[in-house]
Amino acid sequence: MNIKKRFFLLLTFCFISIVSYSLEIKDGMVVDKYNNSVELKEYNRIVLADPAGIEILYMLGAEDKIAAIGKTFMSKIQPVEKTNKLPSVGNITKPSIEKILSFSPDLVILNTMSISTGDSLKKLKIPFIISETEKIDDIFKNLEIYGEFTGKKAEADAIYQDGKKRVDTLKAKLEKEPLNLKGAILYVTTPMLAFNDESLPGEIMRFLGVKNIAGDLKGSRPIISQDLLIRENPDFLAGAMSIKSPDDLKKSAVLKTTAGKNENLFIVDSSKILRGSPRLFEEMEKFYNELVIIKNK
């Protein structure tokens, strides 16, 4: 492997070791990015308006700690057959304060779309934090914290170790044989909106050593113009959210690119790749395997 490739891989993998999390443990408290804090202890009546947090609690076997949840419009929260039956406090973007209070929670976990709800909870002195998974490392840190919140530290550690093994295995494969591809994960096709480098999908692409052609564009869901698409000539395009079929990606400009000509168009599971639960590691493996096929064509 030449020096440039080694340096690129070093930069690709080193970011994981940077200590900066969306939730931090400081002096016996859990502190979020917005400086909200709660005590690091076991809770018994948790209201969650964060899909990733709901999935993590089920994976820990701590569903008995869930008092109620915020529901989603589009994507499903796993395990669907159980989460569909949970009491609701409304939508995750704007859960009802009245409904939250009706469940007498000792902890509320929100997502970044419901920050205004946090302002109301603060006035009512209801303990809450805002969870924002931006990096793979955040998932590991959240596992540690949620294990403490639910009294399931051993279970959290087991899931942590499994996820770490999956990530380390991917690292080893990439170090041995880099993908050297470029592409994008699209949000919608008309106009063509993609995930930038600051998103969780962007983080995954960076981890895999893939150049995100929308990485440096402005906005959280930047527009990829036809000129940019043709100029960058991506090796692949992946669809998420409202894009349900590879055929939806076959726009005229796309067909002029390597991705379109070679039909390197596929769909990723939005409920995994956009959600910071340990299920993401499985989707990363699938994404990697899809890219290996493309690389070897």
Provide a role label for each language-model segment.
Residues K33, P87-E98, L217-Q226:
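Short helix-initiation/N-cap motifs at beta->coil->alpha
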Residues I3, V19-I54, K153-A184, N233, ...:
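Bacterial Sec-exported substrate-binding components of ABC uptake systems
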Residues R45, F140-K141, I145-E148, D157, ...:
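Structured C-terminal subdomain patch of bacterial secreted/periplasmic proteins
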Residues E132-I145, A184-L200:
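Extracytoplasmic ligand-binding site segments that recognize negatively charged/polar headgroups
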Residues L9-I18:
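Bacterial N-terminal signal peptides
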Residues F73-S75, L193-R221:
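Alpha-helical, coiled-coil/dimerization segments enriched in small aliphatic residues
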Residues R45-F103, L107-M113, I213:
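A short, structured surface patch at a secondary-structure boundary
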Residues I97-P105, K123-L124, I224-N233:
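Short helices/loops that flank or line small-molecule/ion binding pockets
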